[in-house]
Curated annotation (Swiss-Prot):
Gene responsible for this protein: murB
Superkingdom to which the source organism belongs: Bacteria
Keyword Ubl conjugation: no
Gene3D superfamilies, A to Z: 3.30.465.10, UDP-N-acetylenolpyruvoylglucosamine reductase, C-terminal domain (3.90.78.10), Uridine Diphospho-n-acetylenolpyruvylglucosamine Reductase, domain 2 (3.30.43.10)
UniProt subcellular location: Cytoplasm
Protein name: UDP-N-acetylenolpyruvoylglucosamine reductase
Source taxonomy: Bacteria, Pseudomonadati, Pseudomonadota, Alphaproteobacteria, Acetobacterales
Keyword vocabulary terms for this entry: Cell cycle, Cell division, Cell shape, Cell wall biogenesis/degradation, Cytoplasm, FAD, Flavoprotein, NADP, Oxidoreductase, Peptidoglycan synthesis
Residue ranges of every copy of the FAD-binding PCMH-type domain listed in the record: 34-198
Function statement: Cell wall formation.
InterPro entries: FAD-bd_PCMH (IPR016166), FAD-bd_PCMH-like_sf (IPR036318), FAD-bd_PCMH_sub1 (IPR016167), FAD-bd_PCMH_sub2 (IPR016169), MurB (IPR003170), MurB_C (IPR011601), MurB_C_sf (IPR036635), Oxid_FAD_bind_N (IPR006094)
Protein family: Belongs to the MurB family.
Chief location: cytoplasm
Cellular component per GO, a single term: cytosol
The organism of origin for this protein: Acidiphilium cryptum (strain JF-5)
Length: 309
């Protein structure tokens, strides 16, 4: 369901910015699934100040959706109304400190892990196994290989929908499994992760193990969006999906991965509706087989294509 009706001429009254604004920008090319309709408006802010001023001046009834690497996202075929804020170069800085790293929201998780390793810092190796960027990782308390963001987060800087910039301690965000309680409409722009000095060879070995594990068990070279469903407490989503007979299941141009069945794949010509429809079929079959209601981990945003059922 979309936000409240927006004034018809809002696009003509956009604030002046130092970044880039585009209209009806296709989102498929920037998502890992390579599907989805256009953003009514795409704003790529130059930096935090540019984003803050834009949001402060933007009519409050205009919906705003932030995206980063779009690695854990299905954009529906009808696109996204309002403004999509895409954080790119001005938000990708990484500063190595003696006991941690401060990084912009657009910094890739794997790149942060590499910077930490190069500085002899341990505790962030798990980030090398998480696709996407830091902003999304904080927003969903991403995790893998026995660790998650709440284990290492010191603070996050967030720009509110009204343009205010505030720093929140990790405890203020109530981080739980694949969830963070962000301020309404807030956009994570920077965060600090703590680490500790470690032995270079051990750090390198741990990261090599994570990369090898991903390569062996996940469809890392496919058009996918990472883990589709959250793991139910005490179980694994992939096991339930397999038990329900969904490994390799095809719907339109989308398929449940044969390699890891908690991953959905765009076989090449899938629509967002194909991928989301396949996910819903998997949820139904798992529910009928096991009684467990799988919860989406991948975010699904936007409108269905006009004329779609």
């Amino acid at each position: 369901m979309m936000a409240a009706p927006v004034m018809a001429d809002w696009r003509a009254a956009l604030p002046e910015v130092r970044g880039r604004i585009g209209f009806d920008v296709p989102l498929g090319p920037v998502t890992w699934f390579r599907v989805g309709g256009p953003a009514e408006v795409m704003f790529r802010p130059a930096d935090i100040e540019d984003l803050s001023r834009f949001l402060a001046a933007l009519a409050p009834e205009v919906p705003v959706l932030p995206i980063g690497a779009a690695s854990n996202l299905i954009v529906r075929d009808g696109g996204i109304a309002g403004v999509v804020v895409r954080l790119v170069r001005g938000f990708a800085d990484i500063e190595v400190q003696p006991d941690g790293i401060v990084a912009g929201a657009a910094a890739l998780d794997a790149t942060i892990a590499e910077h930490a390793a190069a500085a002899g810092l341990t505790g962030l190796e798990f980030l090398s196994g998480i696709p996407g960027s830091l902003g999304g990782a904080v927003a969903m308390n991403a995790g893998a290989y026995g660790a998650e963001i709440r284990d290492v987060l010191d603070w996050a800087e967030i720009v509110g929908r009204d343009g205010t910039v505030a720093r929140y301690a990790a405890g203020d965000l109530a981080l739980t499994y694949r969830h963070a309680r962000l301020p309404e409409g807030g956009i994570v722009v920077r965060a600090r992760l703590h680490a500790r000095p470690g032995e270079a060879a051990a750090i390198a070995a741990r990261m090599a193990d994570i990369r090898a594990s991903r390569e062996a068990t996940q469809p890392v070279r496919a058009r996918t969006g990472g883990s589709t469903f959250r793991n139910p407490e005490g179980d694994k989503a992939w096991r339930l999906i397999d038990e329900a007979g969904c490994r390799g299941l095809i719907h339109g141009g989308a398929q449940v991965s044969e390699k890891h069945c908690n991953f959905l794949i765009n076989l090449g010509e899938a629509t967002a509706a194909d991928i989301e429809g396949l996910g819903e079929t998997v949820r139904r079959r798992v529910r009928e087989r096991t009684g467990v209601e799988l919860i989406w981990e991948i975010r699904r945003v936007g409108l269905p294509c006009r004329g779609a059922a």
